[in-house]
Amino acid sequence: MEADESGISLPSGPDGRKRRVSYFYEPTIGDYYYGQGHPMKPHRIRMAHSLIIHYHLHRRLEISRPSLADASDIGRFHSPEYVDFLASVSPESMGDPSAARNLRRFNVGEDCPVFDGLFDFCRASAGGSIGAAVKLNRQDADIAINWGGGLHHAKKSEASGFCYVNDIVLGILELLKMFKRVLYIDIDVHHGDGVEEAFYTTDRVMTVSFHKFGDFFPGTGHIRDVGAEKGKYYALNVPLNDGMDDESFRSLFRPLIQKVMEVYQPEAVVLQCGADSLSGDRLGCFNLSVKGHADCLRFLRSYNVPLMVLGGGGYTIRNVARCWCYETAVAVGVEPDNKLPYNEYFEYFGPDYTLHVDPSPMENLNTPKDMERIRNTLLEQLSGLIHAPSVQFQHTPPVNRVLDEPEDDMETRPKPRIWSGTATYESDSDDDDKPLHGYSCRGGATTDRDSTGEDEMDDDNPEPDVNPPSS
């Protein structure tokens, strides 16, 4: 195949057929701001989009601006009271006497702060994932991408882990209108708890999560958590340790997913590509390269099953942009040049100005013995599944409605935290070389400072450089 400006063409797959790729992007997504010092920065999506454009990948994409999901769309999963709260809360309303009680009730305020435009941000994220599902349902695309989605921690009636609305659950519910079985795969460093919980009692959705397990947010995803009732054995959890590298990850991902595809035979697949599993992430503990991360997408693409690709975590924002740009290239079937094209954020990718970065020399605490034990345990679990469970087609698919807790309990019970509010960036900067103050991977949030030194960049939302370099 001929190469073009976007890179070297790749084989489309075992069938030799090119993939039609739909790409959802909301131009205002980078304007939303969680607040000073907060690790979650929607601006990373704009940076990824800039790379996608400058690599000319847009020429191979059908680009759509998502329709904003409305309250009724979001209410297909989330409780009416919670949706009403998200629609009405604002920084200006925080002085209302009832605000403090509702913030506690819905777990909003620290990990998940109230910021300007919060509900529109949620509507854009959810609208992109629902729109991606509609494209797949109508057979208008083979792969549908929404890097603004993948917010996997949100629950029916509460925010969690920087996530307010679970766009993934909403997208899967849309897919279930047309597809009998949907496979959800999560490669974020954090367990995909919100999605697993939503579908824990049904066999129409199988959830598979590869994540750091132990003293780490959200503290769920034990290998023995396998689902319940009709969904028993349709939740697969792959608990991992610090330092997971490309070779180790691939040695688990490929055989396990191959077995899942063989046994479950999904009619559609959703892949959450949280980039906090990359080497050097500020909140992550793994050591994956961009290519190692993208190998998961490459493997799933080869099956030629309708595929939704979503974003997720990722807090070293220049590496998030690199990763999601490269994975967009994998989706369309090209291998882009490692040398970055000049773009608005070019200086943020220094000093190497390359698409790929080397993993760190950190120790891989996942021993061969542990890996073999996990692989054998999960393959045995998969061997016991009924092949391709048949279901009566339902226009309203089953969603696990977790029992509402008494409001007093909701206000007082401790909530897990993904990030301590006392842990901040150096001078609230976006210098990706520096970890979060007060954050330690193995123990989660701490109060000790992890690094010292002056910052190279002091902008929470990096400003694009509109002036090209002089020749």
Swiss-Prot record:
Gene Ontology BP, a term: chromatin organization
Control of this protein's activity: Inhibited by trichostatin A.
Result of knocking out the encoding gene: Curling and serrated leaves. Down curling phenotype on both the distal and lateral axis.
Location(s) in or outside the cell: Nucleus, Nucleolus; Nucleus
Known outcome of mutating G127R: In axe1-1; suppression of transgene silencing
Effect of G16R: In sil1; suppression of transgene silencing
UniProt remark on cofactor binding: Binds 1 zinc ion per subunit.
Gene3D superfamilies: Histone deacetylase domain
Chief place of localization: nucleus
Cofactor names: Zn(2+)
E.C. no: 3.5.1.98
Pfam families, alphabetized: Hist_deacetyl
GO molecular function, one term: histone deacetylase activity, hydrolytic mechanism
Listed GO CC annotations: chloroplast envelope; nucleolus; nucleus; Sin3-type complex
Reactions the enzyme catalyzes: N(6)-acetyl-L-lysyl-[histone] + H2O = L-lysyl-[histone] + acetate
Signal sequence annotation: none
In-chain residues carrying the UniProt-annotated modification N-acetylmethionine: M1
Active-site feature positions: H153
The protein's role, per its UniProt record: Responsible for the deacetylation of lysine residues on the N-terminal part of the core histones (H2A, H2B, H3 and H4). Might remove acetyl residues only from specific targets, such as rDNA repeats or complex transgenes. Histone deacetylation gives a tag for epigenetic repression and plays an important role in transcriptional regulation, cell cycle progression and developmental events. Histone deacetylases act via the formation of large multiprotein complexes. Required for rRNA gene silencing in nucleolar dominance.
Subunit structure: Interacts with Coi1, which functions in an SCF complex that recruits regulators for ubiquitination. Interacts with AHL22. Interacts with AS1. Part of the AS1 repressor complex composed of AS1, LBD6/AS2 and HDA6. Binds to EBS and SHL. Interacts with MBD6. Interacts with HDA5. Interacts with FLD.
Family of the protein in this entry: Belongs to the histone deacetylase family. HD type 1 subfamily.
Miscellaneous remark of the record: HDA6 mutations induce high acetylation of histone H4, increased methylation of histone H3 'Lys-4' and hypomethylation of DNA at particular loci, such as the rDNA repeats.
Protein name per UniProt: Histone deacetylase 6
Species of provenance: Arabidopsis thaliana (Mouse-ear cress)
Lineage: Eukaryota, Viridiplantae, Streptophyta, Embryophyta, Tracheophyta
Gene: HDA6
